[in-house]
Amino acid sequence: RKGAPVQQTVQESAKGRSKDRKNNKERTDDRKMREAAEEFLLTKLGISSAWMARQSGMLIRFGEWLYLAPEEMISMEGLKVLRPGLCLLADRKNRFEPAHALALSLDREDTDRVRELTKEEAERYLHGESIPCLEERGWTLLTYEGYSLGFGKASGGQMKNHYPKGLRKSR
């Protein structure tokens, strides 16, 4: 700038470079997070590549949640947005957990990790109880009569319940 002290111009320039470095780091972190999320969807949840291919959009982070937002979405800057798209995953303590909304968006054919529940098992699941299982460890889409109910996590012969507490039926 004309007439500005050299010292001030150098400091502003350094601030600009550090801001650029910070933005580059955030972009790199976002890219790594997106790659890790896609890996989780494909390997840990067994989501089919066909389902992934049908989903057009961009992964965005909104708090601790990862959403699939439409490609043509406008900027949310200055807006109060409740949910910017389909909620896919929560990023908790350096691990991902699938969102209930993701489970409801899936059909049986969309994942290879699916279990059809009996009426009694479905009732127990909707009440928030664990279900005995023979499945290997990991996340499983639980369905009843072909409809997705939510996710469970198999561990130690039990299907741990991950049905949202606010939706659980009381006895």
Q: Can you name each region flagged by the protein language model?
A:
Residues 1-171:
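Polybasic, low-complexity RNA-engagement segments
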